[in-house]
Amino acid sequence: MRTLATIALSFAAGVFAAVLLGVGVWQLWAAGACLLAGLVLLGLKRTMPARLRLRGMLILFALCGALVYTALFQALVQAPVTARCGQMGEFSGTVLSRPVETEWGVRVTIRLSGSAAKAEVYADAEYAGLEPGQQLSGTAQWQDGARIRENDVTAFTSRGVFALLYARGPLTAEEGSAGSIRWLPQRAVYALREKIAAIWPDGDTAVFVTAELTGDRSGMAEEDAAVMTQAGVAHLFAVSGLHCAFLVSLLGLLLPVRRRALGAGLSMAVLLFYMVMVGLTPSVVRACIMQIFLLAAPLLRRESDGLTSLSAALLVILLANPFAAAGVSLQLSFAATLGLVCFSQRLSGFFKGLYRGKKRPVRAVVSFVAANLSASLAAMVFTIPLTACYFNTFSLIAPLSNLLILPAAGWSFMLAFVVTLAGFLWLPAARVLGWGVWALVRYVLWMASALTRLPGHALYFSNRYLKYWLVYAYALFTACAITGERRRKYAVAAALAAMTLLLTVGLNVRLSRCGEMNAMAVNVGQGQCTLLYAGDQAVVVDCGSSNSYVDAGSRAADQLESMGIHRLRAVAVTHYHADHTNGLYQLLARLEVQTLYLPDIEDEYGVRERLLRLAEKNGIEVVYVRRTVECPLGGAVLSLYPPVGEGDLNEQGLTALCSAGDFDVLITGDMAGSTERKLVGQYDLPDIEVLMVGHHGSRYSSSQELLQAVRPETAIISVGDNSYGHPTQEAMDRLSQAGAEIYRTDRQGNILVTVHGGD
């Protein structure tokens, strides 16, 4: 079976190289070189050991095949779609799933007619009733799914989506194959979700169970999602090996089939159905294929090999879509499983060996703890660099979280599955049984919340020194692995890693708190978030982004917690637009906040009401700024001015002025020049050192009147990927003419200004 692993892993290496380095002519040259080298090995029959020669040929020919296959896939599947992008054109395709509600309507995934490529159609809300199998056609603006506004994007192509279609005019929906048995798995998952909602009327439990059984956590409360992520157990909602193992165990309990072959066949069929039902994500495809290998091995009188089944699953996924190699979910799923295959048994043996007694109850507890800890630590070996790169996080509490939460999560998964199936037979009985699931869900969320309240439960790579520590730690343990077998060296390595980690964290906290006052513009893309802090006291003014791929709340919270700040003196909201507020829900879920300052204006988006509900839930004082309010901040003072303009939300926002001695920072939100003129006419603003430029550098903001009144020395523009032309040349010219030195978050990243001695 290791022959299959050699071929599959070599093929995967070729695909990863082609996708991550960029598809191009170099692939064909590299494929030719691999082919030539393989043919050379083929001729070395007498001068090279047969096994080594065969292994080398398999690797080289598989690499050649991968490079050629990826080039052909790009030319035959992606390129024809890309050629139509950037223009208006007709489309037609088969609906693959029910539409998903968006801010402006719905989004629906289709498979384009006559192609293996998928596309996402953005249309009006009237198309929310589309069903899988229907034929959808119309006219749309075609957008390349791999490149958006000069930025390379992998989120779509890794799912096989190569075009984004923005509907123009009415669409035509025909019956197609909707209702046929082909779409039974999709109908099953919709029925499952509806039954879950009927069994558990309280939204929190229903959303948790839906996420656990199907991987769909779109309706989960921000605070619940935050604590699960921070506790390191968010993988419970990525349908994977854990779920498939639970499902097979459940089938063994519900279907006590005596004949092994029949039982294995039924389990395989259910796994395949479940795989299609939850959406063919990389994690569930990998898990199901590995489970099928595990079930089939005894029937074929072979031993199951974890590396072979893992590599076979990777081969299947990459054959279906080579661009899946760039997907974060695939990389995390396979990295975690590779760690389990390589290290879990060794770690388990090590932990079990720590207890040499013979008492059965104690040995049982030791075995349980060893199995859970070894699995958690092994899964983290290769995933820590990935989570650091993609999510900026290193969860220290994850091994303990998995030990305390996974057993309950396993029981809740199996019980929820049984209860949901029972709900199709008799709903009242299912609701009674559902209380057991409710209790398990409450325990999981409570435990996750309790663990995230522990100091140092996670580290964030906003600490710029942490990446160097990570390289050091990996080098340290790698050196241990390639030297002799003495266990003591691992204890020494662990002690050194722990001590240097404490130094790394302490150094960042100390350096970040120097100065009388600090102002940081956090890079949140096209949005705004300003951190103002002095010592251990901090205020956040606005937190949001209009870029869907930017989690403004996480970025701000990561930055604050990496500086040792876990409690906010206040949060101030200039106005209620999403690019200034949609990160606040995550921020309020993760950090304790004393006071929330809001403008006393109504908004049409429901942001104010949602913030009020969160404030009430978390015990946060709410203050409406109807007159000038001063908020002490260590050695500085934050002054908040009430709205002075009229019209839309931009003109009815608050103004913030933070002063430390003679050093002043002014934040005007998104107000336009007409409102800026009212501001300087109504309030005696001082000459300022730093201006957080209004409206991301819009030509309508940063008026001459404002700049002449406050005479900023430094101008910081919070801006990112946008279609408005921000920052505009007109605004940049006015700032330059006013003598301000300009900084931009899209170019410099986070921008920090530190005040020493108030001057």
Name every feature range the model reports, one short phrase each.
Residues 61-235, 554-558, 567, 601-603, ...:
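Membrane-interface helix/helix-cap signal primarily in integral membrane proteins
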Residues 568-579, 601, 691-695:
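Metallo-beta-lactamase
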